[in-house]
């Protein structure tokens, strides 16, 4: 393509009267023909290697103003051709869709339309729900004697109870459950060991009495109080008094005589 542009660019230069080295070759001497051919070849090679170079750079190897004009035309033509080729390629890229590409683009657009439509329906449905929720009837507490009302109920069909009475109901159920468990446990224990309960109670009473008198098992006896100590001292002093001693001796003698009389009655032949 660039070589053809060079050939076409050389045409106008020849028409304008500027002599070309290739045109002068037949009129010149045979010795000058190789030099002119070499100069033309060098000019062509430079134009091919540097198609978009400036006017001065392209005219420097040729050394003439007439040779610079086709170079300018060649650069401009090459630039325009490249731009047109780039536009054609862009058009080809834009128009050359893969098979089914149009369908995919259309399907994407349809999906977007469906999403927007569904979003609109969802928003309208949410608005309807909010409207229905806002217009819901208020409910009253089902506990007897309570007049508390509310409009914030999750399930309209179920009965509603205020927090205070709901907690009270839960507590009552818990207490009832515990009492039932205690009664069941007590009933089974009483039916299984009715006789053992009495024995345990009597044993507990005896143990409590013994502990009160002597303290706990394994320990020393409980220390008597001050009143008990005073009473014990008075008893000892009375027992040691002479009157009490004489009285006790007389009583002992009487007992001994009674015992002897009983023995004589049982065994009349015996004598002490």
UniProtKB/Swiss-Prot annotation:
Phosphorylated. Its main location: nucleus. The keyword Chloroplast does not apply. Disulfide bonds: none annotated. A motif (Nuclear localization signal) lies at residues 163-178. Ubiquitous. There is a cross-link at residue 198 (Glycyl lysine isopeptide (Lys-Gly) (interchain with G-Cter in SUMO2)). Keywords: Disease variant, DNA-binding, Isopeptide bond, Nucleus, Phosphoprotein, SCID, Ubl conjugation. One of its GO terms (biological process) is positive regulation of transcription by RNA polymerase II. The C-terminal domain is necessary for the RFX complex formation. It is linked to MHC class II deficiency 4: An autosomal recessive disorder characterized by immunodeficiency, failure to thrive, and recurrent bacterial, viral, fungal and parasitic infections from birth, usually affecting the respiratory and gastrointestinal tract. Patients may die in infancy or early childhood. This is Regulatory factor X-associated protein. It comes from Homo sapiens. The gene is RFXAP.
